[in-house]
């Protein structure tokens, strides 16, 4: 027995006290603890190092891959170890030999291999290596005391969540048996401290990209082992910045060791940025660690370190992580190492290389301004020593400044486009461009430009101070251009200098002038070196008011006496009236002759003066003359016209031909009524029966009309009406149309051969033949004048002179009478015949007797020249012809005519072309300009000298009236009702007649910035198709036209303007705009042609480009030549330059001349320019422009062998200006003032009744209207 006990004790001694380990880790209630059983490694671990490379480990059997979290560099974080007392303390050695049973609750971890054993006889202490955060091992402590095989229990506690995971030791342990028995009982031994046993345990954190969490491994001096397969040494899916407690327990030590795990944040939360402001980047550096917004870790545990070279200074920063370095060297490289620390252990490290920016350049050592002219100066300088990339040169005059950016390799610059006699300061500095542009200090130099010619004075006004004294005031010119300011006034009358004044202020009082005399006042500005161009204003003195009072007293006395005489005569006539009809008739006849007054013939040199005298006082003298002419001479019977069979052949019952001179037709089959037609023979000037005045044919009398044409051998028919006027039938259409070809009128066959439409008339070539006569057919020319308005008379008497030229071109000596008819055959017919006959008298005898000839017309046909306005129109046509003569030229004769016009004979006299230009009326102030000169509208005018006349300005509606009708129907409606001055807005634009009269153009100034919206409203309301822009936006530093378009969509009130397309050519830019109105459904397309070769000069540099531009514009316009005079005030084309006159006038004139040449093969430069001047002030204002029009037309239409050869637009256009500047100044005399137009209302004489209810007498449609007076030069 003793022996067996001895063997048992010996066996127990061999196994050692640690064969049975009863260590179960205990934790606080509520914590979930995981115990991991580890076996000690037999191999010692290497010593701890501070540098490591995070490995990729795989400790699971399934080959899953994990990546260490800290890429790029390594550091070891020492674990925070908190001891915890062991819950079980064995009291005796024998307790270790007890067999324990425990159920292990293990997480899924990979077990360490268990095949390693300790060397015999060497006691070993179990260690658990811990790596934090990236796997850097820490040295394990080894014990020299022998130790039996044991197990360690590891418990982990999630501090933040309270979960307790426990892995207990296995309850049953195997041990080695020995046959040796011993009765010796092992004495109990004291256990070592677990802090010492697990002192070298480290924690290694590994970031898992797939789960976005950390895995923690426990490591020590020796690789830990697990005795059983369900033992764990790795914790997975730890969120960043979370905390856990790990409890290490082992039966060989007491108490258990607790490790607090503090999981670090991921490096993706940190971003190193350069926060240096650009402006400070040359001497400062700013680096900042940015933390993501959703950062949940304790910011107090984060710290930062920076170390920058070349200074090699280290900067420890607080939680803000921003580094500022100041006073650094410019353009120098710096390298900074930036570190992020977590619990004072390096978590992330980055190197950042930063270069400071360029420094500010130095001031230029020398700047000089020299060689100044009146518009330029030369600036030179020396290069600075510091680094620079270029120069900026600024030159200024108060308050404006303009700068130029110059290259680095220049050292001089010529400043251009300066104002004369102006102080300028030039500032020059160098600059360098890095992260920002840095400008060096400026170096200045001052200079003054030289003097130049001044501009015209502004705001010149003349007014009467008394009957024979005039006040003249003005303002200084915009451009003085010199050191002094003197005003010189010249007073002229009839081209002769009367007085001269010279003073420092522009306030003159010119007295002691002649009464009722026209004067011209010319004001020059002198700046001390140069004399400017004159500003000219006409002004007339008044009559002598004192003498007028005496005259009025005398007139009252004479009038009173005359009134008494008239009353007596009336009484006497009534007393002598007889009841006998024959005696009454005899008395009337005597009275008709007696009521005529004595009017002397007018000589050509007194024609204008006589006209002025008679038109004065609302045409009182003209009215007296006209009313003295009997409407009907009753001594001439009209029995044939009143016969019953003839009454239906008369259009009006009271407009009948006299029996003695009516046109008699051949009798048909004994029918006496077949000889009648309402037509009369009319004598011309010393040529009997030159004309036949007829009524407009009715449907019932068309056959008789052609019978008259055939029998009278007439070859020219002049029709001075339209078939319908004002919805009233005026004349039957008695000729075949081109589609019809031929029409038969009883025995006369009429064939139309040609039809040509011109603006004011239509020419048709007809052939007539008689069925029953063997005589050959005849050619008949039918000319229909279409420009006579429904009411009144033509505004321009030149139109009737032009009609006369066309008629005379087709008439010859062998022709029969010229047949002239309107509707009734008296009013317009008599007017045309009167003009034709009196012009023959003027050409033959140099005098005219208009009154006497009209009396003779009335003796041949009643009511000839039916109303007073027609009577005055005859005088106006004579004045027009006498003043201006024939200025129309055929294209085939243009070259020879132009050569003669340019000849000087003698050389000192003006050429005929210059004399023709001098005869052009200026039309200054011939119409009112009240609207444009109102105070609220003055700011809308670019020039006070170019203000539209009231009668033809373009009014703007305040709101577009939307009609329920379609837009096509609204186009046909007239706009005149809505164009009243009271309800319309103002814009500086005028209607200008185009060659095709009803189709008007608009001449406008370049829009101001504040009138761009009005400009587009005008385009929309007037249905403009094409805009012609003849100016640049800027002239020097002065705006001459606001840019009224932009990229994309522009909105102006209810208008939207969209630039759709842009095309550029060598001569112009074509833009297409789409206009939309909020109250209109359909958009409109408007084309803009911007001329780029006319740079503001008076004449275009490339005339052929202007012709090409016009040809291209015409392709965009609707087809011209509409019949009728319906006046819509719509314009297909709008032309504008700076002021709407200088370049616009030349363009409009050339546009109309080209149309005239293409349509009629004639040009009339004089009349075209005269018409434009009547429409807008300042149109074609120089002789150079006037001569240019002749030259360009001659170049476009050269002649070869007497035939016109039309030139291509690409052909070279040459001009020969034979007038030098000095001679022109001497030869161009300013025309005198135009006369005022007569009043528009006068009363017609008598009344007529229509023959049928559907027709009215002619004079009701031709009611008196004011004549359009032609002003004189």
Curated annotation (Swiss-Prot):
Family classification: Belongs to the protein-tyrosine phosphatase family. Receptor class 1/6 subfamily.
Segments forming domain Tyrosine-protein phosphatase: 622-881, 913-1196
Enzyme Commission designation: 3.1.3.48
Name this polypeptide is given: Receptor-type tyrosine-protein phosphatase C
Active site: 822 (phosphocysteine intermediate), 1137 (phosphocysteine intermediate)
Biased composition (Polar residues): 50-77, 84-111, 141-192
Source organism per UniProt: Rattus norvegicus (Rat)
Gene for this chain: Ptprc
Record keywords, A-Z: Cell membrane, Glycoprotein, Hydrolase, Membrane, Phosphoprotein, Protein phosphatase, Repeat, Signal, Synapse, Transmembrane, Transmembrane helix
InterPro entries recorded: FN3_dom, FN3_sf, Ig-like_fold, Prot-tyrosine_phosphatase-like, Protein-Tyr_Phosphatase, PTP_cat, PTP_recept_N, Ptprc
Transmembrane segments: 547-567
């Amino acid at each position: 027995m003793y022996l067996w006990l001895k063997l048992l004790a010996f066996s127990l001694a061999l196994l050692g006290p640690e064969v049975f380990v009863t260590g179960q880790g205990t934790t606080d209630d509520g914590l979930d603890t995981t115990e991991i059983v580890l076996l000690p490694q037999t191999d010692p671990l290497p010593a701890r190092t501070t540098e490591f490379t995070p490995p990729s480990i795989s400790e699971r059997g399934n080959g899953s891959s994990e990546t260490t979290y800290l890429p790029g560099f390594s550091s070891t974080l020492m674990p925070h170890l908190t001891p915890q007392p062991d819950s079980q303390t064995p009291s005796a050695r024998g307790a270790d030999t007890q067999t324990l049973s425990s159920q292990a609750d293990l997480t899924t971890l990979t077990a360490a291999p268990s095949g390693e054993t300790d060397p015999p006889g060497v006691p070993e202490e179990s260690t658990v290596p811990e790596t934090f955060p990236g796997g850097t091992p820490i040295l394990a402590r080894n014990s020299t005391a022998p130790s039996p095989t044991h197990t360690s229990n590891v418990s982990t506690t999630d501090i933040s969540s309270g979960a307790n995971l426990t892995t207990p030791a296995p309850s049953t342990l195997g041990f080695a048996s020995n046959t040796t028995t011993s009765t010796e009982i092992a004495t109990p031994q004291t256990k070592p401290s677990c802090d010492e046993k697990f002192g070298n345990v480290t924690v290694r954190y590994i970031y898992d990209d797939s789960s976005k969490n950390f895995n923690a491994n426990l490591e020590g001096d020796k690789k830990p082992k697990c005795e059983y397969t369900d033992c764990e040494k790795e914790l997975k899916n730890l969120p960043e910045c979370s905390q856990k407690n790990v409890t290490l327990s082992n039966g060989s030590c007491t108490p258990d060791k607790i490790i607090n795990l503090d999981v670090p944040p991921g490096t993706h939360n940190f971003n190193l940025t350069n926060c240096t402001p650009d402006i400070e980047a040359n001497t400062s550096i700013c680096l900042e660690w940015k933390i993501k917004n959703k950062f949940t870790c304790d910011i107090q545990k984060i710290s930062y370190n920076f170390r920058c070279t070349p200074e090699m200074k280290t900067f420890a920063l607080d939680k803000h992580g921003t580094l500022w370095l100041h006073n650094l060297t410019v353009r120098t490289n710096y390298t900074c190492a930036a570190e992020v620390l977590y619990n004072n252990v390096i978590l992330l490290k980055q190197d950042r290389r930063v270069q400071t920016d360029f420094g500010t350049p130095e001031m230029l050592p020398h700047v000089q301004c020299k060689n100044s002219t009146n518009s330029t100066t030369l600036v030179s300088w020396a290069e600075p020593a510091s680094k620079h990339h270029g120069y900026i040169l600024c030159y200024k005059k108060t308050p404006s400044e303009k700068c130029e950016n110059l290259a680095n390799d220049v050292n001089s610059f010529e400043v251009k486009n300066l104002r004369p006699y102006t102080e300028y300061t030039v500032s020059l500095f160098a600059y360098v461009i890095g992260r920002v542009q840095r400008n060096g200090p400026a170096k200045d130099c001052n200079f003054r430009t030289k003097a130049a010619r001044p501009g015209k004075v502004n705001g010149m006004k003349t007014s009467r101070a008394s009957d024979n004294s005039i006040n003249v005031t003005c303002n200084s010119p915009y451009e003085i251009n010199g050191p002094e300011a003197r005003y010189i006034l010249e007073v002229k009358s009839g081209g002769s200098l009367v007085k001269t004044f010279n003073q420092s202020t522009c306030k003159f009082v010119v007295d002691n002038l002649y009464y009722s005399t026209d004067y011209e006042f010319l004001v020059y500005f002198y700046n001390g070196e140069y004399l400017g161009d004159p500003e000219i204003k006409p002004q007339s003195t008044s009559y002598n008011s004192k003498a007028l009072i005496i005259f009025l007293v005398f007139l009252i006395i004479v009038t009173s006496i005359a009134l008494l005489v008239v009353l007596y005569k009336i009484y006497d006539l009534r007393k002598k009236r007889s009841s006998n009809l024959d005696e009454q008739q005899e008395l009337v006849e005597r009275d008709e002759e007696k009521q005529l007054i004595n009017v002397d013939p007018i000589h050509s040199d007194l024609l204008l003066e006589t006209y002025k005298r008679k038109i004065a006082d609302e045409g009182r003298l003209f009215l007296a003359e006209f009313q003295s002419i009997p409407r009907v001479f009753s001594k001439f019977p009209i029995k044939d016209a009143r016969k019953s069979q003839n009454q239906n052949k008369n259009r009006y019952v009271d407009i009948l031909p006299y029996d003695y001179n009516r046109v008699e037709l051949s009798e048909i089959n004994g029918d006496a009524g077949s000889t009648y037609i309402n037509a009369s023979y009319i004598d011309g000037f010393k040529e009997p029966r030159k004309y036949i005045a007829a009524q407009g044919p009715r449907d019932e009398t068309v056959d008789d009309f052609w019978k008259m044409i055939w029998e009278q051998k007439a070859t020219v028919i002049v029709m001075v009406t339209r078939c319908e006027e004002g919805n009233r039938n005026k004349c039957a259409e008695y000729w075949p149309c081109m589609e019809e070809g031929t029409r038969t009128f009883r025995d006369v066959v009429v064939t139309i051969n040609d039809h040509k439409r011109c603006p004011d008339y239509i020419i048709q070539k007809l052939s007539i033949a008689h069925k029953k006569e063997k005589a050959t057919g005849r050619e008949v020319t039918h000319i229909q004048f279409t420009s006579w308005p429904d009411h009144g008379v033509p505004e321009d008497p030149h139109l009737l002179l032009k009609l006369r030229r066309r008629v005379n071109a087709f008439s010859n000596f062998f022709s029969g009478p010229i047949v002239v008819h309107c509707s009734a055959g008296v009013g317009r017919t008599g007017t045309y015949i009167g003009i034709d006959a009196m012009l023959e008298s003027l050409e033959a005898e140099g005098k005219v007797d208009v009154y006497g000839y009209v009396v003779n017309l009335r003796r041949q046909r009643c009511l000839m020249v039916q109303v007073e306005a027609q009577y005055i129109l005859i005088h106006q046509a004579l004045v027009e012809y006498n003043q201006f003569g024939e200025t129309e030229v055929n294209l085939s004769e243009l070259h020879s005519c132009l050569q003669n016009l340019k000849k000087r004979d003698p050389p000192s006299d003006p050429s005929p072309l210059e004399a023709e230009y001098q005869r052009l009326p200026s039309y200054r102030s011939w119409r009112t300009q009240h609207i444009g000169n109102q105070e609220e509208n003055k700011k809308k005018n670019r020039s006070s000298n170019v203000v539209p006349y009231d009668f033809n300005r373009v009014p703007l509606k305040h709101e577009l009236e939307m009609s329920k009708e379609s837009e096509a129907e609204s186009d046909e409606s007239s706009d005149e009702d809505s164009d009243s001055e009271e309800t319309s807005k103002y814009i500086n634009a005028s209607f200008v007649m185009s060659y095709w009269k009803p189709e008007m153009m608009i001449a406008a100034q370049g829009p101001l910035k504040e009138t761009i919206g009005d400009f587009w409203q005008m385009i929309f309301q007037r249905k403009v198709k094409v805009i012609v822009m003849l100016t640049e936006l800027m002239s020097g530093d002065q705006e001459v036209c606001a840019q009224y378009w932009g990229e994309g969509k522009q909105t102006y009130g209810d208008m939207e303007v969209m630039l759709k397309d842009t095309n550029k050519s060598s001569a112009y830019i074509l833009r297409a705009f789409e206009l939309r109105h909020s109250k209109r459904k359909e958009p409109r397309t408007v084309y803009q042609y911007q001329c780029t070769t006319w740079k503001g000069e008076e004449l275009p540099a490339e005339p052929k480009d202007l012709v090409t531009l016009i040809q291209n514009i015409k392709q965009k316009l609707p087809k011209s030549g509409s019949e009728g005079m319906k006046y819509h005030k719509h314009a297909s084309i709008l032309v504008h330059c700076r002021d709407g006159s200088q370049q616009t006038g030349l363009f409009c004139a050339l546009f109309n001349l080209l149309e005239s040449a293409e349509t009629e093969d004639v040009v009339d430069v004089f009349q075209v320019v005269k018409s434009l001047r009547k429409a807008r002030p300042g149109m074609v204002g120089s002789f150079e422009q006037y001569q240019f029009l002749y030259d360009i037309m001659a170049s476009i239409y050269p002649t070869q062998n007497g035939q016109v050869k039309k030139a291509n637009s690409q052909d070279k256009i040459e001009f020969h200006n034979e007038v030098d500047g000095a001679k022109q100044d001497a030869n161009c005399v300013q025309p005198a003032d135009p006369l005022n137009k007569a009043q528009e209302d006068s009363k017609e004489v008598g009344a007529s009744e229509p023959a049928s209810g559907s027709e009215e007498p002619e004079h009701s449609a031709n009611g008196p209207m004011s004549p359009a007076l032609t002003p004189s030069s």
